[in-house]
């Protein structure tokens, strides 16, 4: 503990002496600090990559071991449930339930059906009157055609 305090006191005095010298020390210090920061960042990134690679290898070995045990005892691999199915089980959820892909597809089909039914008349009595008038219109148009054309 005493060594730490002594270093702090001497270090502070050393910094004050450097500050009296001018900004030259600070420029070199800034360049060195930037280089050190870049080197430290690179070392951290490399360490993280090594850690991830090590973890991946260990996980592969574990999976191989699990597979040998499954084969030995005739067990089947557990299939993970989809996150959507797990989300449905959340009872304490504050927001509304998100729609599944199937529900979205069903809604799209309903909209298409609505578009097709929009072509038909909405009033059934209107449709029946048009159907009942149809034979009379056909007879009238056939009569007009026969008057215009005479068979010889």
From Swiss-Prot:
Composition skew (Basic and acidic residues), residue ranges: 41-82, 90-104
Gene Ontology molecular function, alphabetical: syntaxin binding
Propeptide segments, given as residue ranges: 150-152
Location of region: Disordered: 1-119
Subcellular locations according to the entry: Membrane; Cytoplasm, Cytosol
GO cellular component, one term: terminal bouton
Region of interest (Interaction with the SNARE complex), ranges: 59-75
Coiled coil regions in record: none
Residues with Cysteine methyl ester modification: 149
InterPro entries attached to this UniProt entry: Synaphin
Signal peptide: none
UniProt membrane topology term: Lipid-anchor
Lipidation (S-farnesyl cysteine): 149
GO biological-process terms attached to the record: regulation of neurotransmitter secretion; synaptic vesicle exocytosis
UniProt entry tagged with the keyword Transferase: no
Subunit field text: Binds to the SNARE core complex containing SNAP25, synaptobrevin and syntaxin-1.
Its job: Positively regulates a late step in synaptic vesicle exocytosis.
Protein name as it appears in the record: Complexin
Taxonomic lineage: Eukaryota, Metazoa, Spiralia, Lophotrochozoa, Mollusca
């Amino acid at each position: 503990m005493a060594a730490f305090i002594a270093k702090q006191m001497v270090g502070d005095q050393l910094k004050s002496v450097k500050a009296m010298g001018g900004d030259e020390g600070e420029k070199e210090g800034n360049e060195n600090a930037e280089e050190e920061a870049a080197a430290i960042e690179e070392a951290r990134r490399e360490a993280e990559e090594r850690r991830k690679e090590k973890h991946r290898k260990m996980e592969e070995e574990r999976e191989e071991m699990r597979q040998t045990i499954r084969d030995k005892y005739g067990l089947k691999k557990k299939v993970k449930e989809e996150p959507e199915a797990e989300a449905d089980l959340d009872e304490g959820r504050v927001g509304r339930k998100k729609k599944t892909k199937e529900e979205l597809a069903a809604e799209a089909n309903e909209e298409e059906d609505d578009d097709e039914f929009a072509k038909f008349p909405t009033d059934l009595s209107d449709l029946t009157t048009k159907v009942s008038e149809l034979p009379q219109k056909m007879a009238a148009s056939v009569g007009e055609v026969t008057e215009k054309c005479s068979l010889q």
